[in-house]
């Protein structure tokens, strides 16, 4: 039974630890249930749904009246957006907001088990005040687009830009204007830069490439995006920011970083509470520098990975200094040692293209890095192969690995051909001692060597004999010459 009177806030005696502990447990339970509702609301098809919010009013503390607002996206069809949803275990009331005086009139609806907290679901006017500004501006932009360019408006959800990085498109729009098969669709931003994405005709949504586009353009939950179809496979994208989102929340994946920074800043503020105030001019300059650093964090390297400034063709690579390994809009040079990156640069130069350019979409970044790295290792192994360093089994493993990479879209045909050429060489035993003929020839050579040694020994003996004979002959010839000389001397003596 409804009672037309404000909810009476109840207090507890100060210092009641038991009560506070119970209250903390109940609040944890409430947040868990709200998180479950939030996780179940991330549907890709959100064309006819609108965000809601739940406000938890908890009056349990000893002296302070606390109103805690817990944002929650409860996706409800427009046909029933004025109807009230029931959150299990949380009391429900209907909340009507008075815009003239800023007060809120609340009608309480008793729910079984009600004791501590009240939950409110704002009506449509409150929802529009919460997140309708961006949608309204998007619709205004859509009305000003050329009539010959079909368009649609998309409200960004958690599953679009945070967890899934998958963007489902309106079925009616896809059936009427987009191809039925898988194809590449170009997204042109407001600066005229083009970004390639993969459109899945069967699922009617953008997959690979949308992640890099969303991160690079700081698209956040609550933003509204207008897609203007300017050609068969090209959208011009207009991004309308949700003014309720702080600049620090613009960087996907950095929430925990900012939370940590916030806690650190709060601690420093407490420690410096007694310090004298700084000069106002210095404070303004420091604030500006901090703001610039916050904005630059979006484009800083996360674990060494940074965003590519533009789509790069291999024709633009003039030298190793401007060679980058880009996958899905992310520069992943940091994943490779310098010598491996140089080897990959040489391989790409030999083929005059990026070897990974045609890899299948939706491959994980870890898998892509592994494929490129193993390709580099195989190329280095082929270069270093020799008769005693690489076996037949090594080449067979490399061949199977390269064949699997080829199926994934990696350009490794030239490496496969090189491996096939090596495998096509006549097979020879690695160790000649394993060949029987070699052993026979070795034994025969040994025997021939022994014969040579025996003959050489005989030759030495013969040479000695020849020397002795020569000496004796010389002695005999000398004796004959001496006798002839003596004879001629006597015969020719004077009378």
Curated annotation (Swiss-Prot):
Biased composition (Polar residues): 92-108
Localization: Nucleus
Primary site of residence: nucleus
Record SUPFAM superfamilies: DNA-binding pseudobarrel domain (SSF101936)
Alphabetized UniProt keyword annotations: DNA-binding, Nucleus, Transcription, Transcription regulation
Any Pfam family hit: B3
Name of the protein in question: B3 domain-containing protein Os01g0234100
């Amino acid at each position: 039974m409804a009672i037309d009177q404000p909810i009476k806030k109840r207090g507890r005696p100060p210092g009641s630890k038991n009560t506070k502990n119970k209250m903390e447990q109940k609040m944890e339970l409430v947040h868990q249930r709200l998180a479950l509702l939030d996780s179940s609301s991330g549907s890709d098809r959100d064309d006819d749904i609108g965000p809601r919010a739940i406000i938890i009013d908890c009056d349990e503390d000893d002296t302070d009246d606390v109103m805690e607002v817990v944002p929650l996206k409860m996706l409800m069809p427009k046909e029933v957006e004025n109807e009230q949803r029931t959150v299990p275990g949380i009391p429900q009331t209907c909340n009507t907001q008075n815009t003239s005086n800023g007060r809120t009139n609340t009608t309480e609806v008793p729910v079984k088990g009600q004791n501590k907290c009240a939950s409110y679901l704002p009506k449509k006017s409150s929802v529009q005040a919460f997140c309708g500004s961006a949608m309204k501006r998007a619709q205004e932009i859509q009305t000003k687009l050329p009539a010959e360019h079909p368009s649609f408006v998309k409200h960004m959800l958690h599953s679009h830009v945070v967890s899934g990085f998958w963007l489902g498109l309106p079925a009616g729009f896809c059936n009427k204007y987009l191809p039925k098969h898988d194809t590449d669709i170009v997204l042109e931003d407001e600066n005229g830069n083009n970004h390639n994405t993969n459109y899945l005709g069967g699922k009617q949504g953008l997959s690979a490439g949308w992640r890099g586009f969303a991160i690079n353009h700081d698209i956040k939950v609550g933003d509204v995006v207008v897609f203007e179809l300017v050609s068969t496979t090209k959208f011009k994208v207009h991004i309308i920011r949700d003014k309720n989102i702080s600049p620090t929340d613009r960087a996907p994946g950095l929430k925990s970083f900012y939370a940590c920074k916030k806690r650190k800043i709060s601690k420093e503020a407490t420690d410096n509470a007694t310090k004298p105030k700084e000069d106002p001019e210095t404070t303004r300059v420091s604030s500006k520098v901090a703001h610039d650093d916050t904005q630059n964090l979006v484009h800083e390297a996360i674990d060494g990975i940074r965003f590519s400034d533009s789509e790069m063709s291999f024709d633009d690579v003039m030298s190793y200094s401007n060679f980058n390994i880009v996958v899905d809009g992310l520069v992943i040079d940091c994943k490779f040692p310098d010598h491996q990156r140089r080897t990959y640069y040489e391989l790409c130069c030999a083929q005059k293209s990026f070897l990974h350019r045609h890899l299948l979409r939706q491959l994980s970044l870890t898998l892509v890095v592994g494929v490129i790295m193993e390709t580099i290792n195989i190329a280095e192994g082929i270069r270093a192969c020799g008769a005693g360093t690489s076996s037949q089994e090594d080449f067979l493993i490399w061949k199977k690995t390269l064949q699997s990479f080829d199926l994934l879209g990696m350009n490794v045909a030239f490496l496969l051909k090189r491996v096939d050429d090596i495998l096509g060489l006549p097979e020879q035993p690695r160790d000649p001692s394993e060949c029987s003929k070699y052993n026979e020839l070795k034994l025969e050579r040994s025997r021939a060597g022994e014969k040579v040694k025996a003959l050489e020994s005989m030759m030495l003996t013969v040479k000695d004999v020849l020397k002795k004979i020569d000496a004796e002959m010389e002695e005999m010839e000398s004796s004959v010459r001496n006798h002839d000389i003596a004879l001629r001397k006597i015969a020719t003596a004077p009378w």
